[in-house]
Design a protein with these regions (language model features):
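Structural preference for solvent-exposed beta-strand-turn elements
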Residues: 1-287
């Protein structure tokens, strides 16, 4: 019928070589890499098209190698060797940098000197969204690494416009857009061609909700942009979340600047069940 739930029956996997369009989503490639060791004779994957969210593929390859899977990696090519018996190992799971982005946004929109601390983050993370630490320097957020913790501190920002290619980390688009709104910066983000096939059409959703603040938002297949708005930031705007956890969390950060209403707040449970609890620790009151 074209939608879940679906029934998958056991079958012998036999594919030897596949060609995948990497411009659609890195998730398709990661899923194939994960099942490849169980395919008799292994699997070769050739990638074509525009590169998208490659750090997530790198994380998948790194994990497979840690559990003993042999992989030959070249540009746009992976050969995964068969490994039927995988030995159990123990390793620590670091915190999610995508979730950290909301706290970067809060600090960016706060007064100079404001700071907060987040736990279990690595400076040498393979997560693509760990780039948030570098990105938010432009917004006046300094990241201080303290072992397995990071301290975010608000310092002076010298910009009033922001341009960036998010091809490697498109999940940051909503957070950055809201940060630019809150700071009154102009915004031009590109590399967003995968956002139309996320939980919702995120480009359209962003345009709809940002427009409620009086912004003239332009979107196309790959980008979103809007001019600086140095005027009064509207209060008590009602934000639709489109069943998308990132819409809820990114716009919730605006509460550091103005009152805001988030519809369907429980949507955050997809990735960050304790988000509202942690948000209140920053001083934002939710009810």
């Amino acid at each position: 019928e074209g939608y879940p739930p679906i029934l998958i029956r056991p079958a012998k996997l036999y594919a030897k070589k596949l060609q995948i369009d990497k411009s659609k989503s890195s998730q398709y490639i990661s899923s194939l890499l994960l099942i490849a060791p169980k395919i008799e004779g292994g699997l070769e994957i050739e990638l074509v098209g525009r590169e998208t969210s490659k750090p997530y593929i790198d994380m998948t390859v790194s994990l497979l190698k840690k559990i003993g899977v042999k992989i030959i990696s070249k540009k746009n090519y992976y050969k995964v060797f068969e490994l039927q018996n995988i030995k159990p190992i123990q390793f620590s799971i670091e915190s999610d940098w995508s979730s950290a982005s909301y706290f970067y946004s809060i600090v960016a929109m706060s007064e100079i000197g404001y700071s907060l601390t987040l736990s279990i983050f690595n400076m040498s993370s393979l997560q693509g969204d760990s780039n948030i630490a570098e990105i938010y320097i432009a917004f006046g957020v300094k990241t201080i690494y303290m072992g397995k913790k990071i301290k975010l501190e608000k310092i002076k920002s010298k910009i009033d416009k922001f341009t960036y290619d998010l091809s490697s980390n498109p999940d940051l688009a909503q957070t950055i857009s809201v940060t630019c709104l809150g700071l009154g910066y102009s915004c031009n983000l590109k590399g967003l061609h995968t956002l139309k096939i996320k939980e919702t059409d995120r480009l359209l959703a962003l345009r709809n909700e940002l427009s409620k603040f009086g912004l003239k938002v332009t979107i196309n297949e790959d980008s979103i942009s809007f001019p600086a708005n140095k005027g009064f930031l509207k209060s008590n705007v009602m934000i639709e979340t489109y069943d998308d956890h990132r819409m809820a969390m990114s716009f919730a950060c605006l509460a550091i600047k103005t009152n805001i209403t988030i519809c369907n707040p429980n949507v955050v449970s997809k990735s960050y069940n304790s988000f509202w609890i942690d948000l209140e620790k920053t001083g934002i009151v939710s009810q």
